[in-house]
Amino acid sequence: MIEKLTFGLFKKEDARSFMRLMAYVRPYKIRIVAALIAIFGVAATESYLAAFIAPLINHGFSAPAAPPELSAAAGILSTLQNWREQFTYMVWGTENKIWTVPLFLIILVVIRGICRFTSTYLMTWVSVMTISKIRKDMFAKMLTLSSRYHQETPSGTVLMNMLNLTEQSVSNASDIFTVLTRDTMIVTGLTIVLLYLNWQLSLIVVLMFPLLSLLSRYYRDRLKHVISDSQKSIGTMNNVIAETHQGHRVVKLFNGQAQAANRFDAINRTIVRLSKKITQATAAHSPFSELIASIALAVVIFIALWQSQNGYTTIGEFMAFIVAMLQMYAPIKSLANISIPMQTMFLAADGVCAFLDTPPEQDKGTLAPQRVEGRISFRNVDVEYRSDGIKALDGFNLDIRQGERVALVGRSGSGKSTVVNLLPRFVEPSAGNICIDGIDIADIKLDCLRAQFALVSQDVFLFDDTLFENVRYSRPDAGEAEVLSALQAANLQSLIDASPLGLHQPIGSNGSNLSGGQRQRVAIARAILKDAPILLLDEATSALDNESERLVQQALERLMENRTGIIVAHRLTTIEGADRIIVMDDGKIIEQGTHEQLMSQNGYYTMLRNISNKDAAVRTA
């Protein structure tokens, strides 16, 4: 099918992804059929306007003619011939032609305009709706992807897939479909007119079609990899812009404006270079196609003049032929130039389908416990992030009782955060198993598993919405009284009172209107409202001043009441009251016990505590 539509320029394998996306168009097939009918109207009126010239010159300036003698023979062809003769006489043969001919011309142009508007509107409508559906499915797919995918894939690439490539694949498809159908119909109609007027001259016109097809194929092959590289470069640019925007404080603090500008300039130059190649090919394509068309036109004029001198054609037929041929030039040029946007469309469709085919997060669990008690056990758990054999956790074993507060301490890279990320299955173990209340977490449905946890981390993320909506995110059915209670428990009553909007004050992008301590306490309020049986704290009090830390610590104490808690600590002074402290190094447990027990051993924990005390002394000095 695609070979026929593109005159052999593209093959089935080139359009496999694109044809898959066309499944999104099927619900709108009635509108597409209506658009096709309108496109046919455009092609028919365009063709007839060319044929209009011959009778205008041959009959328009002559005296009124006698009524035609109609055939008495039966049959469809005779009937159609009689209708044509009567219509020609009504328009061109009577003395009323001084107003019927202009009126007929106006009617033709109006019909063409209505058909052109209808086809453009319907195809644009289908394009917009299709893009909306594809983006909806892509966003739904993004929500199913694993945390590892989001960590390893730049945000600019995801944005390019969802915005740029979707637009390129579907919008280009709408334009290309319109060009292919409308201009093919126009060329076909005008070719019929040419054959009707002079079949010998028409053969010369037809001979240029294969030459234009070969020219388009040459530029398609030349630009395939250039267009692909250009799309990838745009994704890289999106990522550079996103990183610079998100990290604007780091850029300013370290005077990294020049470095950021250099990164942007490098990728921008790459895009410019690739765009120049595409533009050069596109610009060179038009003159070559024009040269082929002009040679054909020159030959036609030469032969037509010779035929006219020898009485084989009338002036009206010659003028109509030239007009029809000139009218054919624009659609032929559009068809000849379509290979480049079509190549872009196919490559964009490949990118969209590749994203839609990304494997979702594994969820093979079948169990759906409503609320667990909070007993946790790790059995011989290994975690390998990389393929070089280095393990983040190595034979990790740990049992946590219901309601127990367990703190994980150790140097950076010892595996503390990995333990926390394993429980909601943000990370999958390479070996071993993890159980909650004796149930392997791999056997629990992901949504039910994650409903058992509340997470407060050092990397707080807040939405660009109101305070109320950010807290209620953990429980969308919560009312204002419940949200207010959670905020009060998180020591945020003063924040509510400080704004006339109270609970409904906007907090800015990622809580940019709040202080660090306030952002942390909003995250705690969100966790309090969720009321999950297991609490995960990943360095929740790091990088806070003393007063903010005190308020956050008070909120955390309220949050951890009657819950199993796993606390990743950087400041060891914050976990002295933990029921048990687990000391880790190189993915293994090397010490465990209460604060007093570990200090009495004068081991690794004592060393970490001494280092922490020195750091605290430096901060307060």
Swiss-Prot record:
Q: Where in the cell is it found?
A: Cell inner membrane
The entry's keywords: ATP-binding, Cell inner membrane, Cell membrane, Lipid transport, Membrane, Nucleotide-binding, Translocase, Transmembrane, Transmembrane helix, Transport
| GO molecular function terms noted in the UniProt entry | ABC-type oligopeptide transporter activity; ATP binding; ATP hydrolysis activity; ATPase-coupled lipid transmembrane transporter activity
Q: Which domain of life is it from?
A: Bacteria
**CDD domains assigned to the protein according to its UniProt record, in alphabetical order:** ABC_6TM_MsbA_like, ABCC_MsbA
Question: Quaternary state and partners of this protein?
Answer: Homodimer.
Name the record gives this protein: ATP-dependent lipid A-core flippase
Q: Which gene encodes it?
A: msbA
